[in-house]
Each structure stands twice: as C-alpha cells, then as structure tokens.
Amino acid sequence: MVAPRALIVLLGLALSGAGAGAAAGAECVALEDFSLGSVGEFPPDWKPRKEEGRSVYSIQEEGGLRFLRAAATRLGVQAGREVAWNLEAYPILAWSWRPIEFPKGSDERKSSTNDSAVSVYAVFPHTPVSVKSVKYIWSRVVPVGTHLTSSAGNTQVRVLRTGPDKVGQWVEEQVNVREDYRKYFGGSDVPRPAGIAVLTDSDDTKSTARGDYAGFRVCKP
C-alpha cells in the first residue's frame, strides 16, 4: 500500500482542544501511557485508519509497564490518537519503542518494500480533508539520517534507527518536532499539532512485522 497509507490517518485528527495529560517528569507531560483500557484490547481514545487495525494493535503489560503492541501480517493500518499540545512550550516529542520482527526484505526507499517494524508520526492539520506529518522510523536497512517523502510531500520521513542489533530491546527516543517541521516543510510558523500516530506494517513485503510502543510524552527543551 503506497498512496493510501501515505495519506496518513485522517482519523478525524482535526485541530481540537484536547490537551496533554498528567506530568510524566519535571519537564515533560504525558500524552499516552496506555494506563486506560484493558490488556489485550485496542486502546481507548485511539482510532484505526481501517477497522482491521483493531486486530493489529493492543494494550499489553510487562513488569508493570503498559505499552501498545503491534503485530501485522500482510497489513498496513495506522492507528492514531487526537491530542493537541503547546508546541512552543513543548517542542520535544519523546517515546520508547522496540522492534520485535522486521518485515522480510523491507526497504522504505522503495514503494514495493515500504514497510517498517515500528514508526511514529507527529500529525499536523493541513486542509479540511488532509494532514501533514513528520514520520520517524526504525528501518531494517535504510541508513540513520535518511530523509524520505511521500503523499506528494505531505509526509516527511526521518530514519531514526537502523538495523536489528537491538531487536527486543526498549529504546528511548526524543525528537524536536518543531525543528523537524520547519526543516522539512519550511516557513517559521508551525501549526499546533493535531495528534500522534503509529504504524507497524507488512503489506508491501507480504510478510509479518511486530513491534511495541510506550510512554509518549512531550518535553521542554
């Protein structure tokens, strides 16, 4: 799936008054810790781009940590949560993720193999029927720092990590969403974010992808 997926989770992610939740640290505010909902179920307040996504994503728990597990076989369905925050005060988006199984033969540089074990989107309003987004991926083979585009430029992709060396291990990420938006889309004005989304997909490679996500929060510089 190329064009439909690149259009990224419309999900009703229009700009809203939904704000961030409880503090997750002295300089951070929690967006999602998956503490709501039941283990084994699709998370409340999230929406799949297609209904079949409800079978891909589920809340799990290990050692007291709640997280979102994704397991996709020949599927490419995003899930997202509508949540806005003050980007001027909190430009840093942080989360933890771990790849469990990379899609066989995946390479995000090619439309025929454009699948990822784990990827995270910062979503911004664009038009009444479309969004812009910065997508962060953990690729199987594409070098760290590679910049890719899709959806006629409305999705800008940044490779944060590459390779299987840390398969099964939680890794913490922090990205400056405000700076990345300005870098990739240009201009000094950055719209208020509309939400976050994730995608674990394997439809292009006709294989299986698995990965986990946890602890989404926004932080001061």
Language-model features and meaning:
Residues I100-Q169, A209-D212:
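Extracellular ligand-binding interfaces
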